[in-house]
Amino acid sequence: MEKEMDEDTLLKKLRWRCRRGMRELDQLFGRYLDRRWAQAPAAERAVFLQLLDCEDDKLWRWFMGYEACPDADNAALIADIRAMPA
């Protein structure tokens, strides 16, 4: 039986997955991890993990508002992340 990953190890793995090669996306995802991840409910965490699986070019267009995200849950979290102060 696999052990559940402790929160610190999970955060380190997520931080690595948040490295997108685009500074702006790195900062947006990092901001979420630093400010919201620890208190986020499981459903919101699942949505964030879905975002991490998306392609960078799509994420860029969604975060910059050039294109609407087709998934309502993802779009809501993107809006929340964009609204976080720098």
Swiss-Prot record:
Instruction: Give the UniProt keywords, A-Z.
Output: Chaperone, Cytoplasm
- According to its UniProt record, where is this protein located? Cytoplasm
Q: Which is a Gene Ontology cellular component entry for this protein?
A: cytoplasm
- A GO biological process held by the record: succinate metabolic process
Keyword Iron-sulfur part of the UniProt annotation: no
By sequence similarity, the record places it as follows: Belongs to the SdhE FAD assembly factor family.
Q: What does this protein do?
A: An FAD assembly protein, which accelerates covalent attachment of the cofactor into other proteins. Plays an essential role in the assembly of succinate dehydrogenase (SDH, respiratory complex II), an enzyme complex that is a component of both the tricarboxylic acid cycle and the electron transport chain, and which couples the oxidation of succinate to fumarate with the reduction of ubiquinone (coenzyme Q) to ubiquinol. Required for flavinylation (covalent attachment of FAD) of the flavoprotein subunit SdhA of SDH and other flavinylated proteins as well.
Query: What protein name applies here?
Result: FAD assembly factor SdhE
